UniProtKB/Swiss-Prot annotation:
SUPFAM superfamilies: Small protein B (SmpB). GO terms for cellular component: cytosol. This is SsrA-binding protein. Keywords: Cytoplasm, RNA-binding. It is found in: Cytoplasm. One of its GO terms (molecular function) is RNA binding. It comes from Clostridium kluyveri (strain ATCC 8527 / DSM 555 / NBRC 12016 / NCIMB 10680 / K1). It holds the Pfam family SmpB. Belongs to the SmpB family. It comes from the Bacteria. The keyword Cytoplasm applies. CDD domains: SmpB (cd09294). InterPro entries: SmpB (IPR023620), SsrA-bd_prot (IPR000037), SsrA-bd_prot_CS (IPR020081). Required for rescue of stalled ribosomes mediated by trans-translation. Binds to transfer-messenger RNA (tmRNA), required for stable association of tmRNA with ribosomes. tmRNA and SmpB together mimic tRNA shape, replacing the anticodon stem-loop with SmpB. tmRNA is encoded by the ssrA gene; the 2 termini fold to resemble tRNA(Ala) and it encodes a 'tag peptide', a short internal open reading frame. During trans-translation Ala-aminoacylated tmRNA acts like a tRNA, entering the A-site of stalled ribosomes, displacing the stalled mRNA.
Length: 157
């Protein structure tokens, strides 16, 4: 396989709960500012996006509550696992996110961490929280779609 056909994206962590708890309005890619031991820990799969969210402070966007376990061989160079990490976006993109989050009920949620050309990237989403009845509706829709697919598969055998 040639280098052009090979995908350079490798998912390292995924926030599956976000798709269940939120309506995803828009998503975008952002870089993340990390130290060396954090990159090594993320590459080892020791990161968690479960309760993390994005917040805009003084025109900069930070990701909060993203847990990156300390690197085992990192000794004194390890940082706090839950520290705020700066996301790297253009000012126009931050302004667009600020416009969304100024509206009632919208938040910034990380969907996944992945490697792109050797750099760690975050897939961010602007999302609106789901109510319990919305979650039930989406689960029923998924089940109905799965049943239809199963019946179609059996019919065309």
């Amino acid at each position: 396989m040639s280098a052009k056909n090979k995908s350079n994206n490798k998912t390292l962590a995924e926030n599956r709960k976000a798709r269940h708890d939120y309506f995803i309005e828009e998503s975008m890619e952002a870089g993340i500012q990390l130290v060396g031991t954090e990159v090594k820990s993320i590459r080892a799969g020791k990161s968690n996006l479960k309760d993390s969210y994005g917040e805009i402070i003084n025109g900069e966007i930070f990701i909060r509550n993203m847990h990156i376990s300390p690197y085992e061989k990192g000794n004194i160079f390890n940082r706090d696992p839950l520290r705020d990490r700066k996301l790297l976006l253009h000012k126009k993109e931050i302004a667009r996110l600020l416009g969304y989050t100024a509206q009632q009920g919208y938040t910034i949620v990380p969907l996944s961490l992945y490697l792109k050309n050797g750099r760690v990237k975050v897939n961010l989403a602007v999302a609106k929280g789901k109510k319990n009845y919305d979650k039930r509706d989406s689960m029923l829709e998924k089940a109905a779609k799965r049943d239809i697919e199963r019946q179609m598969k059996e019919r065309f055998r």
